[in-house]
Curated annotation (Swiss-Prot):
Protein residues bound to GTP: 14-21, 61-65, 125-128
Lineage: Bacteria, Thermotogati, Deinococcota, Deinococci, Thermales
Start and end residues of each stretch annotated as G3: 61-64
Assigned protein family: Belongs to the TRAFAC class TrmE-Era-EngA-EngB-Septin-like GTPase superfamily. Era GTPase family.
Gene Ontology molecular function, alphabetical: GTP binding; GTPase activity; ribosomal small subunit binding; small ribosomal subunit rRNA binding
Domain Era-type G as annotated: residue spans: 6-173
Protein's UniProt name: GTPase Era
Region annotation (G2) ranges: 40-44
Subcellular localization: Cytoplasm; Cell inner membrane
One annotated Gene Ontology cellular component of this protein: plasma membrane
Length: 301
């Protein structure tokens, strides 16, 4: 008789820039989600697959829930609500360094319909950097008293391991959604590279420019000498933004490219040749068709 298996979906939600993607990466033990100090680094749902023994979790990392200002923002919020439609548990991540904001209240309202249906874990993150974590946690818990509160740092291996064990234990009996040897993410290789490129661009650009950048991988080829050739495009909305991304004498795009290549080589364990180009796609964030062309494939518009 076959052993029982347990599996389910866990949505990771929260306002922008609270550490959702860092937590996902550390739950999986491998980098699948982009990270930068800027809000809204995550723009679309990303599935991370964790299989341990006879238990499997499909984590759904979501964009930060916020008041949308354009079609991209509407897409990002839609990604959150769709992720909550059919889950077995929710991890609501908040930042213990600060008291709740209207965006946290927005998340709490989005989770209200799930109360009593699935477990909701209120995870107070950045415990290592918070001055008054207990006070902050109490304020967050008051927004959704039915949630189960816990405090941690997404960078603390022991604390993350404890959360992972508790989540695995919550999974209902059922077949695995992905084979045991499946990759840690449902992203294609090109999507994964594009997100790393966008992460490095966001770290090095300022004001509105990082939010106007979209990235797309056009070609991946293994050369005879073993070097991995990658052709990628960075899209911006205006010629002035293109000039900023390229930089004086091409210095900025070179800096972005070098950082991306180094990260890819470290993660892949092989040499990478990164061929970058910057193009203008006017007002792509406001255009539903442009969003679909650039890989944001939900039913926006």
């Amino acid at each position: 008789m076959a052993e029982k298996t347990y599996s389910g979906f866990v949505a990771i939600v929260g306002k922008p820039n609270v550490g959702k993607s860092t937590l996902l990466n550390n739950l999986l033990g491998v980098k699948v989600a982009p990270i930068s100090p800027r809000p809204q680094t995550t723009r679309k749902r990303l599935r991370g697959i964790l299989t341990e023994g006879r238990r499997q979790i499909v984590f759904v990392d979501t964009p930060g829930l916020h008041k949308p200002m354009d079609a991209l923002g509407e897409f990002m919020d839609q990604e959150v609500y769709e992720a909550l439609a059919d889950v077995n548990a929710v991890v609501w991540v908040v930042d213990l360094r600060h008291p709740p904001t209207p965006e946290d209240e927005l998340v709490a309202r989005a989770l209200k319909p799930l109360v009593g249906k699935v477990p909701i874990l209120l995870v107070g993150n950045k415990l290592d950097a918070a001055k008054y974590p207990e006070e902050a946690m109490k304020a967050y818990h008051e927004l959704l008293p039915e949630a189960e509160p816990r405090m941690l740092s997404a960078l603390d291996e022991r604390q993350v391991a404890e959360l992972k064990a508790d989540l695995l234990a919550l999974m209902p009996e059922g077949p695995f959604f992905y084979p045991e040897d499946y990759a840690k993410s449902d992203q294609t290789f090109g999507e994964w590279v594009a997100e790393i490129l966008r992460e490095e661009a966001m770290k090095r650009l300022w004001h509105e420019v990082p939010y106007a950048v979209a990235t797309k991988v056009e070609e991946v080829a293994e050369r005879e000498n073993g070097v991995l050739y990658i052709k990628a495009i960075l899209y911006v909305e205006r010629p002035s933004q293109k000039a900023i991304v390229i930089g004086e004498g091409g210095r900025k795009i070179k800096e972005i490219g070098q950082a991306t290549r180094k990260q890819l080589e470290a993660l892949l364990g092989k040499k990478v040749y990164l061929d970058l180009e910057v193009k203008v796609y006017p007002d792509w964030r406001k255009d539903p068709e442009a969003l679909r062309e650039l890989g944001y494939r939900s039913s926006v518009g």
